[in-house]
UniProtKB/Swiss-Prot annotation:
This is Small ribosomal subunit protein bS18. One of its GO terms (molecular function) is small ribosomal subunit rRNA binding. Transmembrane segments: none annotated. Keywords: Ribonucleoprotein, Ribosomal protein, RNA-binding, rRNA-binding. Binds as a heterodimer with protein bS6 to the central domain of the 16S rRNA, where it helps stabilize the platform of the 30S subunit. HAMAP family: Ribosomal_bS18 (MF_00270). GO terms for cellular component: cytosolic small ribosomal subunit. PROSITE patterns: RIBOSOMAL_S18.
Amino acid sequence: MVRYFRRRKFCRFTAEGIKKIDYKDIMILKNYITENGKIVPSRITGTKAKYQRQLSRAIKIARFLGFIPYTDQHK
């Protein structure tokens, strides 16, 4: 039986000392969105629950204001 290496959970926001995630910081928000426009879950990114809530709220506000698109796959 092959055991897969499991990556250690790592919260980038805790490590960098970021207190609040800003909806105007597009470069950070784009790292947590898939190419389909979905928000990447915290079990994949390793983000703590407190920051995942702030992140999803910031992404939704940025989408509403038109800073980031709802989806990148317009055909």
